[in-house]
Amino acid sequence: MSMQDPIADMLTRIRNGQAANKVSVSMPSAKLKVAIAKTLKEEGYITDYAVADETKPVLEITLKYFQGQPVVETIQRVSRPGLRIYKSKDELPKVMGGLGVAIVSTSKGLMTDRTARQNGMGGEVICYVA
């Protein structure tokens, strides 16, 4: 069976892994998934990520906890294959009043909503993380 939305699958694996208090989660790797993992690490939502280059590349994400509680409270897919969501720089959402981040795909690559606003760019809103 083919996977219809690999990004939603990635976010679900992270959500389920933290609900089960797993140390890490692994999934098939792709450039966009690695870029999302890089952004999550830069924002402090995950500890680390690595790509194991076996016959099929595997992305391993090390989850982060604070005092036994998952750092990621909510992680939600916004734009999906059946309904793409694009926002201009003025329309980019502030997740939880600025406490969370929206990951945005722009012409300059993947970045947070704050960075996109600073660069005066809009794009496709991939997901919300808080």
Swiss-Prot record:
One of its GO terms (molecular function) is structural constituent of ribosome. GO terms for biological process: translation. Pfam families: Ribosomal_S8. InterPro entries: Ribosomal_uS8 (IPR000630), Ribosomal_uS8_CS (IPR047863), Ribosomal_uS8_sf (IPR035987). One of its GO terms (cellular component) is ribosome. Keywords: Ribonucleoprotein, Ribosomal protein, RNA-binding, rRNA-binding. SUPFAM superfamilies: Ribosomal protein S8. Disulfide bonds: none annotated. One of the primary rRNA binding proteins, it binds directly to 16S rRNA central domain where it helps coordinate assembly of the platform of the 30S subunit. Belongs to the universal ribosomal protein uS8 family. Part of the 30S ribosomal subunit. Contacts proteins S5 and S12. This is Small ribosomal subunit protein uS8. It comes from Shewanella sediminis (strain HAW-EB3).
